[in-house]
């Protein structure tokens, strides 16, 4: 039973993100790949920003103050990039356009050109979701609804 539990833990470790330090290419993952029996596909390895608890670099933006590079093997890089971006946005409360651009630049600078299309697609879909949610919130606002209905009434009474 203890052996089975130990194997389960090792399996989990090989799948978990491995942080490398301060945005430097990690080499720890190569140890797992060396002992792994399945061959590593070069197109499935990528690095992305991931939040960290501590940082020594002072900066004005949350993204720059708490991030490390993480290398991960993935069967679905799009989904992993999207989840990582959403996690960064929520954990660091990234709401401004400048901070979102910084996040995109971080992902693009840390990853090979091979993954840039996937990164931009994931970022674009997140951007569209945020924009449509903001537009829906404005349309559903009682102040906006009352103002629009009064303007419509005035328009029809005028003609």
UniProtKB/Swiss-Prot annotation:
Superkingdom per UniProt: Eukaryota
Transmembrane segments: none
Location of the protein in the cell: Nucleus
Location of region: Disordered: 39-60
Tissues where the protein occurs: Expressed in roots, shoots, rosette and cauline leaves, stems, flower buds and siliques.
GO cellular component, one term: nucleus
Keywords: Nucleus, Repressor, Transcription, Transcription regulation
Record has Ligase as a keyword: no
Role noted for this protein: Transcriptional repressor that regulates multiple aspects of plant growth and development through the regulation of BEL1-LIKE (BLH) and KNOX TALE (KNAT) homeodomain transcription factors.
Note: Plants over-expressing OFP6 show flat, thick and cyan leaves, and enhanced apical dormancy.
Name under which the protein is recorded: Transcription repressor OFP6
Taxonomic source organism: Arabidopsis thaliana
Higher taxonomy: Eukaryota, Viridiplantae, Streptophyta, Embryophyta, Tracheophyta
């Amino acid at each position: 039973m203890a052996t089975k539990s130990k194997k389960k833990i090792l399996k989990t470790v090989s799948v978990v993100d491995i942080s490398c330090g301060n945005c430097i290419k990690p080499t720890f993952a190569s140890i797992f790949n060396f002992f792994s029996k399945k061959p590593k596909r070069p197109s499935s390895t990528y690095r992305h920003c991931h939040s960290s608890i501590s940082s020594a670099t002072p900066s004005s933006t949350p993204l720059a103050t708490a991030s490390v590079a993480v290398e991960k093997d993935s069967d679905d890089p799009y989904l992993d990039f999207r989840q990582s971006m959403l996690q960064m946005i929520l954990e660091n409360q990234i709401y401004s356009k400048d901070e979102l651009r910084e996040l995109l630049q971080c992902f693009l600078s840390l990853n090979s050109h091979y993954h840039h299309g996937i990164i931009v697609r994931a970022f674009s879909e997140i951007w569209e979701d945020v924009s449509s949610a903001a537009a829906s919130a404005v349309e559903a606002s009682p102040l906006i609804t009352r103002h629009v209905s009064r303007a419509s009434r005035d328009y029809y009474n005028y003609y």
